[in-house]
């Protein structure tokens, strides 16, 4: 493909360029006419290669001639061009197009008048032209005989399959190898494919489908065939299964022939297309050019995927024309759009050559191209060839718009005219070339004016003219070169000893080309070296090279030597009209020249809005004149630096901005209120989950602390997302429209900035960390800590290397914040060589405190508690409980004042922490402070704390010290793992006996590491102990309470075994409170020992946890009474079960309060529970029991009294996700699978924990339920090849959990426990374990209700799968309906209206939406057609010829 610029060479090209387009005209044929003709021939599906010879041109003319009468002007021009080209090839002298046409006409007439020569040997010639590789060949007798496929052909096919598998290339390869083959030959080819049986099965299915379709469309004739007549082939005959080779040959050579081979080939290609689609699942729509991907690589991927697409050639052509450009990256897209819609692939690839490099370079090229194109067209139209507008330019800094005497940049050393040092420009006596580029441009202008007028239009499209047009400033002429002018570019790497060229000016150097010395621009953006007219030795050949916006004609000299600053290289030099001599990459790469940008582009992170959301459209609120002025200044500066860009009214989004004054400064700071955009932006995963702590630092000999300047503003923002960051600076009194900007970099205050910056910074530092493993770098946001055990000089040298590395990526480390000497201020801490502390904290002294003041105060105290032990904030926090305004004044309580005074005393003495020594043991010591507050210290040596902290979280309303202590230990252990990666040894203020007494009853509360007892008052103790057995001789109290929900009136009382009883009335109470009141009453009325029997699980649960403090006054009173007693036994019995004392007290407290309910079904529920051990929800549902009764039945079962329940986290609950795990019981292995969304269970005892058994179980599971994903641990059976193969075959995705982290397998781990619990309850009902397992699975799936919807796991999984299918169908239906447009007529208006959007289609009417209005139209007055989209619809589209029902089904 592509334009052919080398049709003519040497003298013939000169002959071509001497021929005029018209008789008497001024314009002559040029090389561009050949390029245009070849492009047009491609459009007409003709081979442009035929233009290379006279015979080829004659064939093309004969082909086009019949269409000339009805053809367009373009077709006639093409025929004329080919006629002239034919004359040039045939050496027929002509002066213009008309003469060429006349000459060809004469030749055609001569040819007609010549007698025809005998055609002897034509058959032989024809026969020789036929490839002998075809299976059907003609023998000497003229008969068509079959020649089997050669082993070489079959071997080539097998090799293709082995190497390419089923890539798109396989289809053209198959077509080429099977040209003219019979079905038998094709089956031979398919049979040679050994592997890929799955693909072959798919192919077989496609062939069967097509054969069946053939039989349907070609029914067999009825009755016997006449003698001598051949039968018509059936579908199976075409596939070669029921036909002989002789029959196949006869069908293919009959008159008329039935090409059974071609038909079968077509079927095979259909099947191969389907296989290729499966093996290459990438859609053409997904092929997009990466930001740094070369255009050539992108085109290769595009066409490779296009070949796999199952679409007609027309659709593929459309894809090529539109998608190739649409999915290019922004830099290439801008260039491709400028080339126009008719550009060939060769032109595209030429124009985009080198653009796939750094984004900065590509952006510059694209901008220059856009500017040049618009500028040249205006330039030509106006005829402004008289001169170019000159702009003033500074000799000092090279920028436009001011003179050197007004320049604010530092004065450049040396003379501004010649560049030499020792004198200034006014004293310069050197009349040679100027140091800057203006003199060269002036001479070019003079030369340009000498151009002949008839060449102006053509020259306008050449790079020479374009360069002159844009060369008023270096903004355009310099950007495409090796650098940009400006103060940021004078950066060099001091460690390199190579020649360096400063980029204050464009990098122009004296270069020796052949024997001549010329000034040339070193351009790393140019592929080729192009020099203006120079005499070189050797032969040359003509060539066209593509500039941006056009082509120029040059002479190509090969093997030319060039000397650049003492370095020699040999390569190709192009000589032609160029505005500036250019040394391109073909020479620069040979001499090792590299372009070192101070800001190399960081790869942008793609960002999107949340699905279904649009950008923010929040109006800008009014601002004062002072703030508007400040914002304008700030934004003007930011725009110069490229951080923001101006935008027009086409951007509909807006975010409000405002300004505040900086602390201790008169300067203003711009703030953007990104709250609305943050709500709409996708979620990000924070790369760092917390901040580093100095206690985790190891002591280092040398330390440096630095700061990254303008951190966020050094990272580019995704181009497609920038529009959503738009904001507006308003004007006073709406004097002018607001100035609109959008961000090009990460904005402050936007939710994605921290995560993107952290990710980018980590990638940038990674190579440096690998290079210097002896250096430790802590990086959190823009703070850097660099530590090492190197000598200080060597350390600082490495730090400077790090600064240089960051600078290459555009990150500066300002000297102002570069700390070389201790103490180092880092992350709010103060670091000394052998200790650390928090930066000095001063607590404010205030008369009046607001909520905001208290919040800041608590924050400071929390920060200080890292190193100051004993800090408390509980009473201060109580002051700001509830929802209060930030400015609301707070009145201090006495406790809060005391707490603040204590904290002030603690902070008076400065305290320090030490650094971590990996060789020593970590120890954590915990003390109780009272009022639910705890403090702790972590150290390695006594009195040298690494870190301190406090804890004051109350996790439940009723608690005790041991519960809190367990929570403190867990917090300290977690903190230690985060900072040091291991848990410390604990010293706890509790005795072993007290702890173990609690622990035996409440072991499920939490996990506790190794610990030892420390006698640090106040000691933690249990204030009372409940007896485990009834106390003989003590009075037994049956207690009960009841309340009326409506009146809130209640009664509480007790009955004793000695005949005593008491009932009290209570107001404003609940059932639970009344039950507790009854226990309190019994405790108050009893002696030092008592047995208490209650029917309240609630009361029983609270008191059994042995709290020593509670937020409930009632529970507090019970605790006080329990502490006074010597011994108390508390027991529970189910209510309403005919238990003597319980029944009597129930009758006492129920009178007038609640009606006694006759609860039918209790016995049946109990029987079922004894058999299946159903949970309370299942029984409450199945037997219509109140929840409390069902719970009491479960609670009274000794097999169901297991302690503790698992706490659940969040896991993937998609409908197709299952978790698998192996658990062990009775020395056997049980493989368990849990449907995560429903809790449905499948389990089986397997003989061995092998991949084979696991794979078999997975296949059985997949055969019963729709399994999409299985989540397993990293056990050897799950990671085996057998399991992977089973998952691949069944189309199941396999995911793995996190090693040594059971939470990642939460659902199945929990189900293992549940399964074992159920097995334990019913084990005595089964002889074998495998029977018990299946019984337990049945009970869990169908006899236990609860969870979402209160249904069983079996009901839930069926409901989830059914809902998923319905949802998918509904979505598909909605999408299908949306593909149709409706044309309709109103009742009185005969004109068809539309197209409208189809919302719903019924039998008698349709619901449509037209311009926002929803209408119901009778079915007979509506036409429904498929909407093929604007690009697909053509003139031949017949809307009414659709079967809408079929399309919509």
From Swiss-Prot:
Motif range (Nuclear export signal): 16-22
Activity regulation information from UniProt: Protease: The viral protease is inhibited by many synthetic protease inhibitors (PIs), such as amprenavir, atazanavir, indinavir, loprinavir, nelfinavir, ritonavir and saquinavir. Use of protease inhibitors in tritherapy regimens permit more ambitious therapeutic strategies. Reverse transcriptase/ribonuclease H: RT can be inhibited either by nucleoside RT inhibitors (NRTIs) or by non nucleoside RT inhibitors (NNRTIs).
Is-annotated flag, keyword tRNA-binding?
no
Q: Where is this motif: Nuclear localization signal?
A: 26-32
Residue spans annotated as Zn fingers (Integrase-type) read 1160-1201
Site, Essential for RT p66/p51 heterodimerization: residue positions: 997, 1010-1011
EC number(s) from the headed UniProt entry? 3.4.23.16, 2.7.7.49, 2.7.7.7, 3.1.26.13
Write out the residue ranges of the motif Tryptophan repeat motif.
Answer: 995-1011
Where in this protein does the record put region Interaction with human PPIA/CYPA and NUP153?
191-229
Q: Which residues bind DNA?
A: 1380-1427
Active site (UniProt): 523 (for protease activity)
Which residues are Mg(2+) 2-binding?
1040, 1075, 1095, 1146
The record's misc note reads: The reverse transcriptase is an error-prone enzyme that lacks a proof-reading function. High mutations rate is a direct consequence of this characteristic. RT also displays frequent template switching leading to high recombination rate. Recombination mostly occurs between homologous regions of the two copackaged RNA genomes. If these two RNA molecules derive from different viral strains, reverse transcription will give rise to highly recombinated proviral DNAs. HIV-1 lineages are divided in three main groups, M (for Major), O (for Outlier), and N (for New, or Non-M, Non-O). The vast majority of strains found worldwide belong to the group M. Group O seems to be endemic to and largely confined to Cameroon and neighboring countries in West Central Africa, where these viruses represent a small minority of HIV-1 strains. The group N is represented by a limited number of isolates from Cameroonian persons. The group M is further subdivided in 9 clades or subtypes (A to D, F to H, J and K).
Entries under PANTHER family matching the protein? ENDOGENOUS RETROVIRUS GROUP K MEMBER POL PROTEIN, RNA-DIRECTED DNA POLYMERASE-RELATED
Specify the protein name: Gag-Pol polyprotein
**Source organism per UniProt:** Human immunodeficiency virus type 1 group N (isolate YBF106)
